Amino acid sequence: MRPIRIIGTLLTLAAFFLSAATGAQEAAFDPDAEMFPVDVQYDARIPTPEQFLGRPLGAAPVRHHELVEYINKVSGLSDRLSVEVIGYSHERRPILFVVATSPANQARIDDIRTQHIALTEPDLRQSVTADMPVITWLNYGVHGAEASGMDASLPTVYYLAAAQGAKVDQLLAGSVILVTAVFNPDGHANRVAWLDTYGSRVVNPDPNNMEQDYDGRVARTNHYGFDLNRQWLSVTQPESRAWMRKWHEWRPNVSVDYHEMGSEQTYYFAPGIPTRTHPLIPDESMQLIADVVAPAEQFMDSQGRLYFHGDRYDHFFLGKGAGFPLVNGGIGILHEASAARGVARKTSNGLRTYRENILKHFRTSIANAEGALQQRDALLQFQKSFYDSASERAGNHSVKAYVFAAPGDDARLYHFVDLLNFHRIEVRTLAQDVTEGGITYRAGEA
């Protein structure tokens, strides 16, 4: 009988220690602590994304309706946030625009915007004042297949609403942070539907898994196959017209664009290839980018995460999210995470997870906002001097205006004028006939 009692005692002790060890492991894993800065207190009234979703971020993609419900929930609980629907996709999904700043700034947000825009109007002679906030724009999910960007908007909004302490108070007092979630709702919904259809609670990181065998080009675009990251100039789609209208209303100092790239890469953010910069982009822009991303570099270094600059991506095409701001008095910063494609994926560089990409995009979002605040005066002065210089060069240029017409094609003329007006380019109807290059442009028709 004694051996039986000893064995029973050992089994009991083993069960106890196993239970204790399991309990310790469960207590040690806190998804919120893993995702968010641990040296910050948070407003307990505001639910974390994990609490709201009922699962850790990255365990499954966030559906569009979940994002909308969460952002509206958090906005209703925080006096730091305001949210509005700025448009709808072709499939009738709303595009949300969040303004995050201090309660004091929220109370005078229209005045802040008006004063900021005045920096881009040389005739108004607006100077940079000591209390003028820097404007940071964060956009997520323009390529729907690159889904971690959209999911990163949830912890970003949570942090801006719930984080407490002097550091975040200073950030919100000195900044207006504009979050557009999500740029491409229909493309993202397409991608999420595939992941939910072929994914499983038992994660399979094999690249040959059906979950990852997806043609990303389908969800990269919007409902009608338009690449919305080539729409910053042409603005023919309802999604791009919605967020570009807001961009022009604010003319941000810093615009950050979040993407995913090939799974065998690490993590990229600007500045890009130095020899591939459009000649219209001021040299000072590249130095400002390097200064603003310094906190993002510090975060990546602090966690021992790999990243790179100056390769693969350039600053040449001006019709995308990281290019257009560079010729409009601000800076554009591209971020690219190596895609997990599903929840997890085996690569030659190790296991890539969806959650890891969400974390990196979220933490660099906050870091970029902090970098913008650190460079507030330089960014605002650069914006003012950019438009002052452009106005001076235009005044000294031999060409004062361009004349155009589209005889017999009123629709073509209408859409061209609409495009110019959308980008705040002044257009006037000819008051008298003008002959140029052997062509006569009739008054009222050109």
Q: What are the residue ranges of the model-derived segments?
A:
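Positively charged n-region of N-terminal signal peptides that target proteins for export
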Residues: 1-5
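Bacterial N-terminal signal peptides
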Residues: 8-19
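Intrinsic-disorder/low-complexity accessory segments
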Residues: 25-147, 151-176, 224, 230, ...
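Active-site metal-binding loops of divalent metal-dependent hydrolases
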Residues: 142, 183, 260
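Short, conserved secondary-structure transition motifs
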Residues: 172-191
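Aromatic- and acidic-residue-enriched segments that line the glycan-binding/catalytic groove
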Residues: 191-205
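Aromatic- and acidic-residue-enriched carbohydrate-binding clefts of CAZyme catalytic domains
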Residues: 206-226
